[in-house]
């Protein structure tokens, strides 16, 4: 109800996610007031109603292949987004539980990844830029080692994460903040009138870019540190709580 009421008052509601458009839950995209989406960590901004792409920022093919080669030094599975679909080596998908202890993550990956026999060969044969590369780690210390090493070795790659054991690798100019600013310009909305909600490191640039930034109650400490407000958790409808208190009742931000 809070989202619907906000939309009725003229606010534009936009999901901003690391997922591709088709991987956003159906019950979200079925909301009648949703038109625009920021997806794949800002690699793409879409008009879901017309199918128009408003912004695109992708990894060069050579960079993607080098990232996959680099990932081979870690005990990690990797996949990629190309053409708005997640692709993964079949062998990795068959061992998805080895790399992911969280059953929700296992279910998500199985639902949203298309298996191929050899992902690198598949990407090379397509010969096109890739939207994102993702790594999932069994060992969290190794994840932090990989974060530092990839950041140092690939200055043209932005390294973020959205759940406990992953790293998400995008083009350095693909981030939710740049996407938010581009969409605001497209819609003629002053940036100071934008509000962003987030809980993970892939939300940081968006939260810094927005006129008002709100951390979810379950947000990582580095996310809370950059935000103007902290609301309740995802599971306790923190977005709705903030909207009711600060937006629907006309409280000045």
Language-model regions, residue ranges each:
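Active-site phosphate-binding/coordination module
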Residues: 1-103
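Short, acidic loop-to-helix structural element flanking the phosphoryl-transfer center
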Residues: 1-11, 56-63, 115-120, 171-185, ...
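Short active-site oxyanion
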Residues: 10-14, 33-35, 132, 192-193, ...
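Short, well-ordered alpha-helical microsegments
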Residues: 21-25, 143, 177, 203-204
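Alpha-helix termination/capping residues and helix-transition junctions
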Residues: 30-31, 127, 188, 224
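Short, structured coil segments at secondary-structure junctions
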Residues: 32-33, 40-41, 49, 153-155, ...
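Conserved acidic, metal-coordinating active-site core of Asp-based
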Residues: 70, 74-77, 81-197
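Mg2+-dependent phosphoryl-transfer enzymes with acidic/Ser/Thr/Gly-rich catalytic loops
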Residues: 152, 167-253
């Amino acid at each position: 109800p809070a989202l619907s009421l906000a939309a009725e008052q003229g606010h534009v509601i936009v999901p901003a996610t690391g997922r591709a458009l088709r991987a956003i839950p159906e019950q979200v995209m079925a909301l009648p007031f949703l038109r625009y989406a920021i997806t794949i960590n800002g690699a793409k901004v879409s008009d879901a109603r017309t199918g128009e792409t408003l912004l695109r920022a992708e990894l060069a093919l050579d960079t993607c292949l080098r990232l996959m080669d680099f990932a081979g030094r870690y005990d990690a599975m990797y996949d990629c987004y190309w053409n708005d679909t997640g692709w993964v080596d079949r062998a990795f998908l068959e061992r998805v539980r080895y790399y992911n202890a969280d059953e929700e993550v296992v279910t998500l990956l199985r639902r949203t990844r298309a298996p191929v026999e050899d992902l690198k060969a598949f990407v090379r044969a397509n010969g096109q830029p890739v939207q994102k590369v993702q790594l999932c780690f069994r060992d969290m210390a190794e994840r932090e080692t990989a974060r530092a090493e990839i950041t140092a070795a690939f200055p043209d790659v932005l390294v973020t994460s959205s759940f406990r054991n992953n790293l998400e690798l995008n083009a350095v100019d693909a981030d939710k903040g740049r996407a938010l600013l581009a969409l605001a310009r497209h819609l003629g909305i002053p940036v100071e009138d934008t509000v962003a909600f987030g809980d993970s490191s892939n939300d940081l640039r968006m939260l810094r870019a927005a006129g008002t930034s709100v951390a979810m109650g379950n947000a990582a400490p580095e996310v809370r540190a950059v935000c103007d407000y902290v609301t309740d958790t995802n599971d306790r409808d923190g977005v709705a709580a903030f909207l009711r208190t600060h937006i629907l009742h006309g409280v000045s931000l």
